[in-house]
Amino acid sequence: MSKKGLIGVQMSTIAPAKMPSFEPFEVMGRLTDIGFHCAEVSQVPMTKENVAGFRKAIDELNFNISSLTASIDPMFPGMPGEYLSNEDDYKKYLDDARTLNVDMFRIGMMPMNAIGDVQKCIGGGITPPYSNNTVIYK
């Protein structure tokens, strides 16, 4: 991928909930057709099939996944999902990121119990002031 800056698409704008059928390779192909070559993956279930579809787009379309959206903890206690605070989920996040050549996670929103508590934010990997809530891992 070029070293030039890229203008991409945030997947939440075309996520599965907004489309009757969602197949990552097909969607990335359509984005490529209209001039986009980069996306942040957000609000897309990271199933094996979806990760494989994104990987295929990287390999065959020269598509770039700039970042993945991640959650530190459930927004509310008991809320289902994958969270960086869970060791197995954390490993899956890292595996998905490595598979997709991604080195950034975007934290969309802190859990409700951390809002207004700088120490909880720092403990969750966010350094105030946090611009776009991005956490870079290496």
Over which residues does each language-model region extend?
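Aromatic-lined substrate-binding rim segments of carbohydrate-active enzymes
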Residues: 48-69, 129
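Active-site acidic/histidine proton-transfer and metal-coordination neighborhood
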Residues: 60, 64, 79-138
